[in-house]
Amino acid sequence: MIANLKSKLRAMKSSALPGKSEAVRGAGTTARGAGAEGMSNPEQGGNSGKECSPDPESRLDRDRLGGTVASGPDGVFVRKQTIYGYEESYGRIPLYDLQNAVFTDSFWWTRLDRDLCPKDIVFLDTETTGLAGGSGTVAFLVGLGYVGEKGLVVDQYLMRDFDEEVPMLQAVADQLRRHSILVTFNGKSFDWPLLESRMILSGVPPIHWVNAHLDLLPVARRLWGARLPDCTLSTLEKEILSQHRTDDIPGSMIPDIYLDFLKSHAPGKMRQVLQHNEWDIAAMAALLVHFAVLYHDPETDRDACELLGIGKELERAHRIRQAEVCYRKCIGLSPHPFVLHAKKRLAYLTKRYRGPQEAMELWADLAGKEGSSLYFPLIEMAKFLEHQEKDFPGALECTEKAIRLANRFSDSDIGSKRLQAELLHRRQRLMEKMRRRMEQWG
């Protein structure tokens, strides 16, 4: 099926364009905010393709696409390089932090087996012929970002037709091998599996990221999933980075734009596709910087949602004192919808590491709120009063309140039959204990 698709697309191309000499070519490295005089020393990309000698047609296409025709052992492709200087910001995030020390002690929140080192990181984003993946989907544009001497370097690799896929993938693999940590956004489920499968099918030895692939999407969800409508990259740019793109194209349009490009080889909207991909790389770099700053000093004032998310991650990493500080800071921002969750986490944390006596005050506070529909603090209080204090009447009172709440919410999970059965069993046990005590003491 893939071969038929390739043949069909080549036929459409040849009918619209006599030969490959009319294919889009660009030239050079672009530095944001700099003229051509400042571009004489582009960042070196290893063996990621040698530039072909420019010709008049290539120079003509420089302003239309901005790339360079590069050659590899098995053919040619288009390569474009852009540098974001360290003096620049993406949204409200200064990029100089890319080379800063905020990445030390980062393994506990990245969940990798090592700390992040800026020089080891490579950012990856792909643009593909389909959004659903599958055997017929090809990555026609691969963007890679990494830390260079002058700033964030964004290398983009574009295939103008399917016969340029192998040399393009070889160049991409050469650049990837220069780094030891891969950073993507939703790349664990889409970008990298797709690229890896295309490398294998093309005979390019793939790279294996053993516990060295950081997907920023789960990190974002842990911090802001409860506050934002979604955690797409576009939402994070607007709400977190304060970056608003102008003249951007929706990602859903990109496959059709590329198919049109294959037919005509006219640049058209392909320049916007390259810009979209470049912005995605820059956004990932800015997000990583922001994550590192947030987690580098987690006890600094944050908003309630961030404090709750950081506290959970600290708790997971067994950094209990810092987790408690984050939860208490979140609670101090009351009234706020996240305060309840922080109190719940703090109560369980206190019970586990300091004992139930210390947690009683938090449970009593949660259960005593006017209009509270929380049953879990009542159950925890009942457990403590029954098993530790032997206060059976007090435990029974808490259990009765929990039963009334469960009956009120019988149509929801909070009033499930299992919960009601457990509460009724607890009540029966407490009443039996009280009866035996009365018989014993008369």
Residue ranges and their predicted role:
Residues 1-118:
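N-terminal accessory regions of nucleic-acid-interacting proteins
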Residues 109-181:
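Conserved RNase H-like, two-metal-ion catalytic cores of nucleic-acid enzymes
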Residues 149-239:
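Conserved DEDDh/DEDDy metal-dependent 3′-5′ exonuclease domain
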Residues 222, 228-301, 308:
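Acidic, Mg2+-coordinating catalytic module of metal-dependent nucleases/exonucleases
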Residues 310, 345-346, 381, 395, ...:
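Structural register within alpha-helical repeat arrays
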Residues 314, 349-350, 385-386, 431:
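Residue at a conserved register position within TPR or TPR-like alpha-solenoid repeats
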